[in-house]
Regions:
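Pre-Walker A adenine-sensing motif
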Residues: 1-3
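C-terminal accessory "lid"/substrate-recognition subdomains
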Residues: 153-201
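Short C-terminal domain-edge/linker segments immediately following a structured domain
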Residues: 40-44, 68-71, 115-119, 145-151, ...
Length: 201
């Protein structure tokens, strides 16, 4: 690890939501190859076209990890990163992932920077029962990225965001277009905007 406390990011989202597209964009567009990144890739996830692109980045080291009893279990780390990014297992309980990452961060003297949820809008618009899972993710999140909106009514997207505004959610809701966000630095800015105070305890 470097002398300064590395900043830790956690990305929630279901498989197929474009998490790794966004991850590549944040690293490539937000860090511009200037900082060493340790990317925790969840075991058992289906491959993504962006896996090879992430592996090709000179500043990125990749380590496999899994959740076990709300704890982080990972392969050996040989990097000294400035930024650490955990991709949460797509089928995991958001609370378990939050507990695991907080414990790992505290143990390794790191600092939580931001929690990000990538929303698969097309899936959620057709599977309302999944909203409780996304609610849990967004409860912990500073930034909510609305992705996979193809074929989704604009009113649904607007109503989705307004629903959280009515609950006084302080999170930023941003659109993803073709796997990219408008301003990666805005997403990575280590400013807490989450409803949950769990990571601040």
């Amino acid at each position: 690890m470097s002398d300064q406390a590395p900043l830790v990011y956690l990305i929630y989202g279901i498989p197929g939501s474009g998490r790794r597209d966004v991850l590549f964009d944040l690293i490539d567009g937000g860090l511009e190859g200037k900082e060493q990144v340790l990317y925790f890739h969840p075991e058992g996830e289906a491959t993504s076209p962006f896996d090879e692109q992430l592996e090709a980045l000179d500043t990125v080291s990749i380590v496999n990890w899994k959740l076990s009893d709300a704890s982080v279990v990972h392969d050996q780390i040989d990097a000294a990163p400035e930024k650490i990014i955990f991709l949460a297992p797509g089928n995991s309980d958001p609370a378990d992932a939050a507990e695991a990452i907080k414990s790992w961060t505290d143990l390794n003297n790191c600092q939580i920077a931001r929690i990000i949820t990538v929303v698969h809008c097309a899936f959620l618009s057709e599977n309302s029962a999944a909203k409780a899972w996304f609610d849990a993710c967004i409860h912990f999140s500073d930034v909510v990225l609305l992705n996979r909106r193809e074929g989704v009514n604009n009113k649904w997207v607007k109503d989705f965001e307004v629903g959280y505004r009515k609950q006084f959610s302080p999170a930023r809701f941003l659109m993803v277009k073709k796997g990219r966000v408008a301003n990666p630095l805005e997403v990575l800015e280590p400013e807490a905007r989450r409803l949950s105070l769990y990571f601040d305890e």
